[in-house]
Amino acid sequence: KGEAGNGIRLSASSAAAGVTATATAMTGGAADPDLTPALAAVANAGHHIITSPFARQESLLALREHLEFVSGPLEQRGAIGVFGHPGTLATGTQLAGQINSGRISGAWYPGSRALPCEIAAGYAAVLASEEDPARPLNTLEIKGLDITDPTDWSGRTEQEAALHGGLTPLEVGPGRRVQIVRAVTTYLKDPQGIDDPALLDLTTIRTLDYVRKACRDRISLRFPREKLSERTPPKVRSELLDVLVKLEELEIVEAVEANKTSLIVERDSQDVNRLNARIPTDVVNGLHVFAGRIDLLL
């Protein structure tokens, strides 16, 4: 069944006196299926979230290439990908570092009997349920996953290491519910190899995709058959500014008034039919860290 089959967990027990049972871990699986043909088949179908059944470098690199294509400047159909990881923190962060994508997020649930595909499916379902791209996913429950042994639960130190290593930690919360600690992507470094937190939170890329679509939809609705004259850029700029103001009211972006001078719409110097726009987008961040100091008064 491929390398993924090695992740199937087996256990055995016996209630008969004097009889012991031993379960041998699954081995021998190799060569997971290539995801490239499947991704190519759905490239033009339209999607927002793709779940990878395999948590392997080859599969996730193929997914990364696909997401960069459909979300790029030509297709402009923003999408994200997810995978699951029930293994160790070390192997998970190593895998995340190999992917380094702001569009791929991996859910880490150590010690789970669930397969990576099952963890990923549950995680993706929660992502799809949140319609506000800027709202954090902290504490949201992932249904259908097993409750791991307390010896496998991650502590705050491990969770922080996971977050800054490109993994989304899952934990067993009150009422024995599996919850998201904080949703992050595998993006850790820029092309120069320098640590870059710009796209670490999953909400950032989802917000940017949301803003892009909102702006494109407004221009398509207002100017379906527009002439391009000297009067056109100011009208387009006014519409874009209105979109940003409305997004600010929804707390998806902020500081629109302070940044509006950076909103530039101008005709292209080479293509007579093209209008270029520079749209400043100050995304609303999530409240993930609270720091306080207790002063003793006597």
Show which residues each predicted segment covers:
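Glycine-centered small-residue hotspots that permit tight backbone geometry or close packing
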Residues: 29, 125, 165-166
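Polar low-complexity, Ser/Thr/Gly/Ala/Asp/Asn-rich disordered segments used for subunit assembly
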Residues: 1-117, 259-261
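Loop-centered beta-sheet repeat module
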Residues: 87-162
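Structured, hydrophobic secondary-structure cores that serve as assembly/anchoring elements
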Residues: 134, 139-152, 158-298
